[in-house]
Regions:
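Mature catalytic domains of secreted/periplasmic carbohydrate-active enzymes
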Residues: 2-314
Length: 314
C-alpha cells in the first residue's frame, strides 16, 4: 500500500496543488495550523493493508511541499500541531501487523529557501521573476535534505524500503549528492531496499537497465501508472526487479472532487499482470485531512482482500 498524506489533504485538490495552482507560500502555510491528524489511526491502516493481502506499506514522510510528518530538528515545518510524531506511530503499527516498513522521501522541497524557485519547471514560483535564485545556495539545501534523511534512517528502527522521489531535467544523480546520500542510508539501514529515482522519474529505468550501474542506482525500477508490456529486463536480457505504482482514482493525495475510481476488478487484473511479469504492485490511497481513508478506497481494498484470500497462493 502506498499512502500519500500531508498538508495538501486540506485544500483537497491533490498533492501537487501548490505547483499546479502556482500557490504562494503565504497562502499554503496556514494549512499547517489546521493539520491536526484528528482521526489518524495507523493501526487501522495497517490492518486494512494486511487484510487486502499487502506485505508492505510506503507512507510519505515528506512530499514536495516540504512538510514533514516526522519530528525534525532541522525545521519547524512539521507536524507539531498534531502533537504527535506520525511516522513513529506508523512504523510501530506496521510492525504489530508483521508488515514491512516503507518510507517515501522526496528529493524536492518547495518550502526550503535554497531550493530553486524561478525557472524550475515544477516549482510553484517558477513563473515569478521576483523569486530569483540569485541568493540561493543549493549546497545548503542538499545538506538539509541529507540531515533529514539521516534522521528518518536513525530514529525509527529498521526501515525496509526507502522510496525516493524523483529526478528530472538536470536535477538527478550527483546534483542530489546521490552517492553520499545512498551510502549513508545503507550504512544506517543495512538490508534496506531503495528505488531508482535518484537517477530517474517514473518513466525511466536507470543505469541498471543499461548494465552500467552508478553508485546510486537503487535496487528496483519504479514505473508509475503503467505496466511494462513484457516485464522489465536489462539490455542484456536479464530480468530486473520492479514495482509498478498506481492510484485508485486520478490523484495520489486526497482530492475531494475526484470520483473517477478504477473498478476493483481492473485493479485486480493489474495486480495479476504485474505478478505474472515478475513485478510488484504498489496501490495508493490518499487519506483526507483528518486521516480517514475515503470510503470508495476502503470498498476497493475490501474487494481486493476478499479476492486475495481465495487466490493469493496461486
Amino acid at each position: 500500500m502506498f499512502i500519500h498524506w500531508g498538508l495538501y489533504s486540506i485544500p483537497a485538490r491533490g498533492e501537487w496543488v501548490r505547483s499546479t495552482e502556482e500557490m504562494p507560500e503565504e497562502e499554503y502555510l496556514p494549512f499547517m495550523k489546521e493539520f491536526d491528524a484528528r482521526d489518524y489511526n495507523p493501526k487501522q491502516w495497517a490492518k486494512e493493508a494486511k487484510a487486502a493481502g499487502m506485505k508492505y506499506v510506503v507512507l510519505t514522510a515528506k512530499h514536495h511541499d516540504g512538510f514533514c510528518l516526522f519530528d525534525s530538528k532541522y525545521t519547524d515545518y512539521k507536524v507539531t500541531n498534531a502533537g504527535r510524531d506520525l511516522i513513529k506511530e506508523y512504523v510501530e503499527a506496521l510492525r504489530e501487523e508483521g508488515l514491512k516498513v516503507g518510507l517515501y522521501f522526496t528529493l524536492l522541497d518547495w518550502h526550503h529557501p535554497d531550493y530553486p524557485h524561478y525557472g524550475d519547471r515544477i516549482h510553484p514560483m517558477r513563473n515569478h521573476p521576483e523569486c530569483s535564485n540569485e541568493n540561493r545556495d543549493f549546497s545548503r539545501y542538499i545538506e538539509y535534505m541529507y540531515n533529514q534523511v539521516e534522521e528518518v534512517c536513525t530514529n525509527y528502527g529498521k526501515i525496509d524500503i526507502m522510496w525516493f522521489d524523483f529526478s528530472y531535467d538536470d536535477m538527478r544523480g550527483e546534483k542530489w549528492g546521490a552517492t553520499r546520500l545512498i551510502d549513508m542510508v545503507r550504512r544506517l539501514q543495512p538490508g534496506i531496499i531503495i528505488d531508482n529515482r535518484l537517477e530517474v522519474s517514473g518513466e525511466g529505468r536507470g543505469s541498471l537497465y543499461d548494465c552500467n550501474p552508478t553508485p546510486y542506482h537503487g535496487d528496483f525500477v519504479s514505473p508509475e501508472q503503467i505496466i511494462p508490456p513484457e516485464g522489465i529486463c536489462d539490455k542484456e536480457g536479464n530480468p530486473m526487479v520492479w514495482e509498478a505504482c498506481f492510484t485508485m482514482n486520478n490523484n495520489w493525495g486526497y482530492c475531494a472532487n475526484d470520483h473517477y475510481y478504477k473498478p476493483a476488478s481492473m485493479l485486480i487484473k493489474k495486480l495479476v499482470e504485474c505478478v505474472s511479469k515478475g513485478g510488484n504492485m504498489l496501490l495508493n490511497v490518499g487519506p483526507d485531512a483528518k486521516g480517514n481513508i475515503p470510503q470508495q478506497s476502503m470498498e476497493i481494498l475490501h474487494t481486493i482482500g476478499a479476492w486475495m484470500k481465495k487466490n493469493s497462493s496461486s
